[in-house]
Amino acid sequence: MQFVLFGPPGAGKGTQAKFLSEELNVPHISTGDILRENVKKGTALGLKAKSYMDKGELVPDNLLIDLIKDRLSQPDCRKGFLLDGFPRTIPQAEALDEILDDINKKLDGVINIDVGSGELIRRLSGRRICRSCGASYHLVFNPPKAKDLCDSCGGELYQRDDDKEVAIKNRLDVYVRQTQPVLEYYKKKNLLIDIDGEKEIDEVTADVKAAIRKLA
Protein backbone atom coordinates (compact mmCIF):
# COMPACT_ATOMS: atom_id res chain seq x y z
CA MET A 1 0.00 0.00 0.00
CA GLN A 2 1.15 3.52 -0.79
CA PHE A 3 0.51 6.43 1.58
CA VAL A 4 1.54 10.05 2.01
CA LEU A 5 1.66 11.41 5.57
CA PHE A 6 0.97 15.03 6.56
CA GLY A 7 1.00 16.74 9.94
CA PRO A 8 2.14 20.09 11.35
CA PRO A 9 5.07 20.47 13.78
CA GLY A 10 4.00 19.06 17.15
CA ALA A 11 1.28 16.77 15.74
CA GLY A 12 3.14 13.55 16.63
CA LYS A 13 3.69 12.66 12.98
CA GLY A 14 6.98 10.86 13.72
CA THR A 15 5.27 8.51 16.18
CA GLN A 16 2.52 7.65 13.69
CA ALA A 17 5.03 7.27 10.84
CA LYS A 18 6.93 4.64 12.86
CA PHE A 19 3.70 2.77 13.62
CA LEU A 20 2.47 2.91 10.00
CA SER A 21 5.79 1.71 8.61
CA GLU A 22 5.77 -1.30 10.96
CA GLU A 23 2.04 -2.03 10.54
CA LEU A 24 2.20 -1.99 6.73
CA ASN A 25 5.72 -3.45 6.56
CA VAL A 26 6.79 -0.70 4.15
CA PRO A 27 9.66 1.81 4.33
CA HIS A 28 9.11 5.23 5.90
CA ILE A 29 10.61 7.63 3.36
CA SER A 30 11.30 11.25 4.25
CA THR A 31 12.79 13.77 1.85
CA GLY A 32 15.36 14.72 4.50
CA ASP A 33 16.55 11.11 4.77
CA ILE A 34 16.74 10.75 0.97
CA LEU A 35 18.86 13.89 0.67
CA ARG A 36 21.20 12.89 3.52
CA GLU A 37 21.60 9.34 2.19
CA ASN A 38 22.43 10.45 -1.35
CA VAL A 39 24.87 13.10 -0.14
CA LYS A 40 26.54 10.55 2.17
CA LYS A 41 26.87 7.97 -0.63
CA GLY A 42 28.15 10.60 -3.04
CA THR A 43 25.64 9.69 -5.78
CA ALA A 44 25.38 11.91 -8.84
CA LEU A 45 22.02 13.25 -7.60
CA GLY A 46 23.41 13.61 -4.07
CA LEU A 47 26.37 15.68 -5.26
CA LYS A 48 24.03 17.96 -7.21
CA ALA A 49 21.81 18.37 -4.14
CA LYS A 50 24.84 19.07 -1.94
CA SER A 51 25.89 21.96 -4.17
CA TYR A 52 22.61 23.70 -3.31
CA MET A 53 22.56 22.67 0.36
CA ASP A 54 26.12 23.95 0.92
CA LYS A 55 24.98 27.40 -0.23
CA GLY A 56 21.95 27.27 2.06
CA GLU A 57 19.61 27.11 -0.94
CA LEU A 58 16.55 24.92 -1.40
CA VAL A 59 17.06 21.85 -3.57
CA PRO A 60 15.10 22.59 -6.79
CA ASP A 61 11.96 20.61 -7.59
CA ASN A 62 13.34 18.81 -10.65
CA LEU A 63 16.25 17.40 -8.61
CA LEU A 64 14.06 16.51 -5.63
CA ILE A 65 11.61 14.74 -7.95
CA ASP A 66 14.45 12.71 -9.50
CA LEU A 67 15.59 11.69 -6.00
CA ILE A 68 12.03 10.66 -5.04
CA LYS A 69 11.59 8.67 -8.26
CA ASP A 70 14.90 6.87 -7.69
CA ARG A 71 13.95 6.00 -4.08
CA LEU A 72 10.45 4.75 -4.94
CA SER A 73 11.94 2.51 -7.62
CA GLN A 74 14.07 0.61 -5.05
CA PRO A 75 13.21 -3.07 -4.30
CA ASP A 76 12.05 -2.35 -0.72
CA CYS A 77 9.20 -0.21 -2.13
CA ARG A 78 7.67 -3.03 -4.16
CA LYS A 79 5.09 -3.74 -1.44
CA GLY A 80 4.45 -0.05 -0.86
CA PHE A 81 5.83 2.97 0.98
CA LEU A 82 5.01 5.76 3.40
CA LEU A 83 6.09 9.12 2.00
CA ASP A 84 6.71 11.94 4.49
CA GLY A 85 7.66 15.54 3.61
CA PHE A 86 6.70 15.27 -0.06
CA PRO A 87 4.73 16.63 -1.86
CA ARG A 88 4.67 20.14 -0.39
CA THR A 89 3.28 21.96 -3.45
CA ILE A 90 0.76 21.27 -6.23
CA PRO A 91 3.52 20.89 -8.89
CA GLN A 92 5.21 18.33 -6.61
CA ALA A 93 1.89 16.49 -6.14
CA GLU A 94 1.41 16.37 -9.91
CA ALA A 95 4.99 15.15 -10.33
CA LEU A 96 4.31 12.37 -7.79
CA ASP A 97 1.27 11.31 -9.84
CA GLU A 98 3.54 10.98 -12.88
CA ILE A 99 6.19 9.04 -10.94
CA LEU A 100 3.57 6.58 -9.69
CA ASP A 101 2.16 6.18 -13.21
CA ASP A 102 5.67 5.38 -14.46
CA ILE A 103 6.18 2.64 -11.85
CA ASN A 104 2.58 1.33 -12.14
CA LYS A 105 1.51 2.30 -8.65
CA LYS A 106 -1.15 4.57 -7.18
CA LEU A 107 -1.72 6.23 -3.83
CA ASP A 108 -4.06 4.39 -1.48
CA GLY A 109 -4.50 7.36 0.83
CA VAL A 110 -3.16 10.64 2.19
CA ILE A 111 -3.20 10.68 5.99
CA ASN A 112 -3.39 14.11 7.62
CA ILE A 113 -2.77 14.29 11.38
CA ASP A 114 -4.92 17.30 12.25
CA VAL A 115 -4.24 19.33 15.41
CA GLY A 116 -5.54 22.83 16.24
CA SER A 117 -3.08 25.70 16.57
CA GLY A 118 -3.83 26.22 20.29
CA GLU A 119 -2.90 22.63 21.13
CA LEU A 120 0.18 22.74 18.90
CA ILE A 121 1.41 25.90 20.64
CA ARG A 122 0.85 24.23 24.04
CA ARG A 123 2.85 21.20 22.96
CA LEU A 124 5.70 23.06 21.28
CA SER A 125 6.10 26.01 23.65
CA GLY A 126 6.49 23.75 26.69
CA ARG A 127 9.88 22.43 25.64
CA ARG A 128 12.88 23.36 27.80
CA ILE A 129 16.55 22.56 27.14
CA CYS A 130 19.45 22.30 29.60
CA ARG A 131 22.16 24.88 28.86
CA SER A 132 24.85 22.54 30.20
CA CYS A 133 24.12 19.04 28.89
CA GLY A 134 21.39 19.63 26.27
CA ALA A 135 18.82 17.37 27.96
CA SER A 136 15.26 18.04 26.82
CA TYR A 137 12.18 18.46 29.04
CA HIS A 138 8.55 19.48 28.63
CA LEU A 139 6.65 21.49 31.23
CA VAL A 140 3.50 19.38 30.71
CA PHE A 141 4.61 15.98 29.39
CA ASN A 142 8.07 15.54 30.93
CA PRO A 143 8.67 18.22 33.60
CA PRO A 144 11.92 18.49 35.57
CA LYS A 145 11.81 17.51 39.25
CA ALA A 146 12.97 20.99 40.30
CA LYS A 147 11.69 24.08 38.49
CA ASP A 148 14.06 25.36 35.78
CA LEU A 149 16.80 22.88 36.75
CA CYS A 150 18.06 19.81 34.87
CA ASP A 151 17.50 16.47 36.64
CA SER A 152 20.75 15.08 35.21
CA CYS A 153 23.31 17.83 35.87
CA GLY A 154 21.53 20.63 37.73
CA GLY A 155 22.08 23.00 34.80
CA GLU A 156 19.73 25.87 33.98
CA LEU A 157 16.79 25.08 31.68
CA TYR A 158 15.87 27.59 29.00
CA GLN A 159 13.36 28.03 26.17
CA ARG A 160 14.84 28.18 22.68
CA ASP A 161 13.78 31.14 20.53
CA ASP A 162 12.08 28.85 18.00
CA ASP A 163 10.01 27.30 20.83
CA LYS A 164 8.53 30.69 21.79
CA GLU A 165 4.90 31.36 20.89
CA VAL A 166 5.54 34.00 18.19
CA ALA A 167 8.04 31.76 16.38
CA ILE A 168 5.72 28.75 16.64
CA LYS A 169 2.80 30.74 15.20
CA ASN A 170 4.99 31.79 12.27
CA ARG A 171 6.04 28.17 11.63
CA LEU A 172 2.43 27.00 11.76
CA ASP A 173 1.27 29.81 9.44
CA VAL A 174 3.93 28.81 6.90
CA TYR A 175 2.90 25.15 7.21
CA VAL A 176 -0.81 25.90 6.65
CA ARG A 177 -0.14 28.22 3.68
CA GLN A 178 2.12 25.63 2.12
CA THR A 179 0.13 22.45 2.68
CA GLN A 180 -3.52 23.56 2.49
CA PRO A 181 -3.59 23.63 -1.34
CA VAL A 182 -1.98 20.16 -1.45
CA LEU A 183 -4.52 18.76 1.02
CA GLU A 184 -7.33 20.24 -1.11
CA TYR A 185 -5.75 18.62 -4.19
CA TYR A 186 -5.96 15.19 -2.55
CA LYS A 187 -9.41 15.87 -1.11
CA LYS A 188 -10.72 16.38 -4.65
CA LYS A 189 -9.24 13.00 -5.54
CA ASN A 190 -11.02 11.40 -2.54
CA LEU A 191 -7.68 10.34 -1.07
CA LEU A 192 -7.56 12.58 2.01
CA ILE A 193 -8.02 10.93 5.42
CA ASP A 194 -8.20 13.43 8.30
CA ILE A 195 -7.18 12.01 11.68
CA ASP A 196 -7.87 13.88 14.94
CA GLY A 197 -4.36 14.31 16.37
CA GLU A 198 -5.54 15.95 19.61
CA LYS A 199 -6.46 12.59 21.15
CA GLU A 200 -4.08 10.45 23.23
CA ILE A 201 -1.29 8.87 21.16
CA ASP A 202 -2.79 5.35 21.41
CA GLU A 203 -6.18 6.64 20.27
CA VAL A 204 -4.64 8.44 17.28
CA THR A 205 -2.82 5.23 16.36
CA ALA A 206 -6.07 3.24 16.65
CA ASP A 207 -7.83 5.73 14.34
CA VAL A 208 -5.01 5.50 11.80
CA LYS A 209 -5.18 1.69 11.97
CA ALA A 210 -8.96 1.72 11.42
CA ALA A 211 -8.59 4.04 8.42
CA ILE A 212 -6.00 1.72 6.83
CA ARG A 213 -8.14 -1.36 7.38
CA LYS A 214 -11.03 0.25 5.51
CA LEU A 215 -8.75 0.60 2.48
CA ALA A 216 -7.16 -2.86 2.67
Curated annotation (Swiss-Prot):
Oligomeric form and interacting partners: Monomer.
Principal localisation: cytoplasm
Catalytic activity: AMP + ATP = 2 ADP
CC per GO annotation: cytoplasm
Protein name: Adenylate kinase
Region (LID): 126-163
Function text: Catalyzes the reversible transfer of the terminal phosphate group between ATP and AMP. Plays an important role in cellular energy homeostasis and in adenine nucleotide metabolism.
GO MF term list: adenylate kinase activity; ATP binding; zinc ion binding
Binding site for AMP: T31, R36, E57, L58, V59, G85, F86, P87, R88, Q92, R160, R171
InterPro entries: Adenyl_kin_sub, Adenylat/UMP-CMP_kin, Adenylat_kinase_CS, Adenylate_kinase_lid-dom, P-loop_NTPase
Pfam families reported in the protein's UniProt record: ADK (PF00406), ADK_lid (PF05191)
